[in-house]
Amino acid sequence: MPRNSTNKQMAVLSFIHKQVDAHGYPPTVREICGAVGLSSTSTVHGHINRLIKKGYLKKDPSKPRALEITPAGLEVLGITPKQTQIPLLGVVAAGEPILAVQDATDFFPIPPSIPDHDDLFMLTIQGTSMINIGILNGDKVIVRRQETANNGDIVIAMTSDNEATCKRFFKEQGHIRLQPENDTLAPIILDDVTILGKVVGLFRDDIF
């Protein structure tokens, strides 16, 4: 295929992505014509069909203008896909630490209150050690994946025994203190921990 034709295909793909990203729906064929410098709508249809065959676009035949950029299409454009759902990875203890299950069991939409959508996951809390700040047994916490934390952050931490726990993080002289938010429980004192992420949100199935 001539290089010019391939370049036009990439221009079409890029314009479709920009329009969907900005407006939530793809452009019309005539809008694509104007954006990429083509006068023939049939030529644009040809480029779209070839992009579909290459796996860069997909189309819902039951809906008009229902073009969607595929992961392969984003990759060829050099674009990292945005995370649109949060995977629920399992259970983490908010009392005695237990092993974290690293397989997604469900997916939840990202709340609009969380502007940065990248590297999020959810874990179900088991225990009552964080009840003073309203994290209850059975709640699901939204976690942003990161390896560092500031003193006072609520984190998901992995201990040297490969057990995960939700606590408030404090780095002190000679040790790490994982502080529960429950007046009846003592802190966990460790030489070192691995930070899996910072808690940035909360989801509760039942409010009564």
Curated annotation (Swiss-Prot):
Which catalysed reactions does the entry list for this protein? Hydrolysis of Ala-|-Gly bond in repressor LexA
Q: Which GO terms describe its biological process?
A: DNA repair; DNA replication; negative regulation of DNA-templated transcription; proteolysis; SOS response
Alphabetically sorted, this entry's keywords are: Autocatalytic cleavage, DNA damage, DNA repair, DNA replication, DNA-binding, Hydrolase, Repressor, SOS response, Transcription, Transcription regulation
Q: Known CDD domains for this protein?
A: S24_LexA-like
Q: What is its EC number?
A: 3.4.21.88
Among Gene3D superfamilies, the record links this protein to: Umud Fragment, subunit A, Winged helix-like DNA-binding domain superfamily/Winged helix DNA-binding domain
Instruction: Please give the subunit comment from the record.
Output: Homodimer.
| Function per UniProt | Represses a number of genes involved in the response to DNA damage (SOS response), including recA and lexA. In the presence of single-stranded DNA, RecA interacts with LexA causing an autocatalytic cleavage which disrupts the DNA-binding part of LexA, leading to derepression of the SOS regulon and eventually DNA repair.
Annotated protein name in UniProt = LexA repressor
* Species of the source: Limosilactobacillus fermentum (strain NBRC 3956 / LMG 18251)
Taxonomic classification, please? Answer: Bacteria, Bacillati, Bacillota, Bacilli, Lactobacillales
Gene assigned in the entry: lexA
